[in-house]
Amino acid sequence: MPDVGTARCDFPGGDASVLFKSIRKLLSLPPETRLFMCHDYPPSERDVRFETTVREEREQNIHVHDGVDEERYIEMRTNRDRGLAMPVLILPAVQINIRAGHFPPAEDNGTAYVKIPLNVL
Protein backbone atom coordinates (compact mmCIF):
# COMPACT_ATOMS: atom_id res chain seq x y z
CA MET A 1 0.00 0.00 0.00
CA PRO A 2 1.27 3.49 -0.76
CA ASP A 3 1.41 4.61 2.88
CA VAL A 4 3.40 1.54 3.95
CA GLY A 5 5.78 1.27 1.01
CA THR A 6 7.49 -1.90 -0.11
CA ALA A 7 8.56 -5.24 1.32
CA ARG A 8 11.81 -5.68 3.15
CA CYS A 9 14.65 -7.36 1.27
CA ASP A 10 16.79 -8.76 4.06
CA PHE A 11 15.27 -12.23 3.99
CA PRO A 12 17.18 -15.13 2.42
CA GLY A 13 17.49 -14.46 -1.30
CA GLY A 14 16.14 -10.92 -0.96
CA ASP A 15 17.53 -8.28 -3.31
CA ALA A 16 16.48 -4.61 -3.30
CA SER A 17 17.57 -4.14 -6.91
CA VAL A 18 15.46 -7.06 -8.12
CA LEU A 19 12.47 -5.83 -6.13
CA PHE A 20 12.82 -2.30 -7.50
CA LYS A 21 12.97 -3.55 -11.10
CA SER A 22 9.96 -5.80 -10.56
CA ILE A 23 7.95 -2.96 -9.03
CA ARG A 24 8.88 -0.60 -11.87
CA LYS A 25 7.62 -3.19 -14.39
CA LEU A 26 4.27 -3.25 -12.60
CA LEU A 27 4.18 0.53 -12.40
CA SER A 28 4.69 0.78 -16.16
CA LEU A 29 1.20 -0.65 -16.68
CA PRO A 30 -1.69 1.74 -17.43
CA PRO A 31 -2.54 4.02 -14.48
CA GLU A 32 -6.00 2.53 -13.96
CA THR A 33 -4.61 -1.01 -13.58
CA ARG A 34 -5.81 -2.55 -10.34
CA LEU A 35 -3.16 -4.17 -8.13
CA PHE A 36 -4.11 -6.74 -5.51
CA MET A 37 -1.68 -7.07 -2.61
CA CYS A 38 -1.02 -10.32 -0.80
CA HIS A 39 -0.99 -8.67 2.64
CA ASP A 40 -1.06 -5.30 4.34
CA TYR A 41 0.41 -3.96 7.55
CA PRO A 42 -1.77 -0.88 8.04
CA PRO A 43 -1.05 1.94 10.42
CA SER A 44 -3.53 2.14 13.30
CA GLU A 45 -5.50 4.97 11.68
CA ARG A 46 -6.75 2.96 8.68
CA ASP A 47 -8.36 -0.38 7.90
CA VAL A 48 -6.61 -3.22 6.09
CA ARG A 49 -6.62 -2.83 2.31
CA PHE A 50 -5.89 -5.33 -0.44
CA GLU A 51 -6.32 -3.24 -3.59
CA THR A 52 -4.59 -0.19 -5.04
CA THR A 53 -3.89 1.12 -8.55
CA VAL A 54 -0.78 1.83 -10.56
CA ARG A 55 -1.68 5.54 -10.42
CA GLU A 56 -1.97 5.53 -6.63
CA GLU A 57 1.36 3.74 -6.22
CA ARG A 58 3.17 6.00 -8.69
CA GLU A 59 1.84 9.13 -7.01
CA GLN A 60 1.84 8.17 -3.34
CA ASN A 61 4.00 5.15 -2.51
CA ILE A 62 6.43 6.32 0.16
CA HIS A 63 9.24 4.14 -1.23
CA VAL A 64 8.77 3.92 -5.01
CA HIS A 65 6.72 6.90 -6.17
CA ASP A 66 7.66 8.49 -9.48
CA GLY A 67 11.03 10.21 -9.17
CA VAL A 68 12.67 7.57 -6.96
CA ASP A 69 15.54 5.97 -8.86
CA GLU A 70 17.04 2.54 -8.26
CA GLU A 71 20.11 3.81 -6.41
CA ARG A 72 18.03 5.88 -3.99
CA TYR A 73 15.62 2.98 -3.44
CA ILE A 74 18.40 0.46 -2.74
CA GLU A 75 20.04 2.82 -0.25
CA MET A 76 16.72 3.46 1.55
CA ARG A 77 15.67 -0.21 1.57
CA THR A 78 19.08 -1.45 2.77
CA ASN A 79 19.31 1.13 5.57
CA ARG A 80 15.73 0.59 6.67
CA ASP A 81 16.02 -3.20 6.66
CA ARG A 82 19.22 -3.03 8.69
CA GLY A 83 17.29 -1.39 11.54
CA LEU A 84 14.31 -3.77 11.58
CA ALA A 85 13.97 -6.55 14.11
CA MET A 86 13.73 -10.12 12.89
CA PRO A 87 10.05 -10.90 12.19
CA VAL A 88 8.37 -13.09 14.80
CA LEU A 89 7.50 -15.79 12.26
CA ILE A 90 10.69 -15.73 10.16
CA LEU A 91 11.95 -19.18 11.23
CA PRO A 92 8.76 -21.11 10.43
CA ALA A 93 8.21 -19.00 7.30
CA VAL A 94 11.67 -19.79 5.91
CA GLN A 95 11.14 -23.49 6.55
CA ILE A 96 7.92 -23.47 4.54
CA ASN A 97 9.11 -21.04 1.85
CA ILE A 98 12.29 -23.01 1.15
CA ARG A 99 10.06 -26.02 0.48
CA ALA A 100 7.94 -24.02 -2.01
CA GLY A 101 5.01 -23.85 0.41
CA HIS A 102 5.00 -27.54 1.30
CA PHE A 103 5.11 -28.65 4.91
CA PRO A 104 7.94 -30.93 6.07
CA PRO A 105 7.25 -34.66 5.88
CA ALA A 106 5.46 -36.22 8.83
CA GLU A 107 7.56 -37.83 11.53
CA ASP A 108 7.02 -41.34 12.92
CA ASN A 109 3.93 -40.22 14.83
CA GLY A 110 2.27 -38.92 11.62
CA THR A 111 2.68 -35.24 12.50
CA ALA A 112 4.65 -32.68 10.48
CA TYR A 113 6.60 -30.16 12.56
CA VAL A 114 8.17 -26.79 11.96
CA LYS A 115 11.24 -26.82 14.20
CA ILE A 116 12.55 -23.73 15.95
CA PRO A 117 16.06 -23.68 17.45
CA LEU A 118 15.92 -22.52 21.06
CA ASN A 119 19.59 -21.84 21.73
CA VAL A 120 20.50 -19.90 18.58
CA LEU A 121 18.46 -16.70 18.74
Describe each PLM feature range.
Residues D3-D10, F36, D40-S44:
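Generic detector of bulky aromatic hydrophobic side chains
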Residues M1-F20, R24, T53-E57:
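His/Asp/Glu-rich metal-coordinating catalytic cores
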Residues K21-R34, D40-L121:
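Accessory terminal helices/loops
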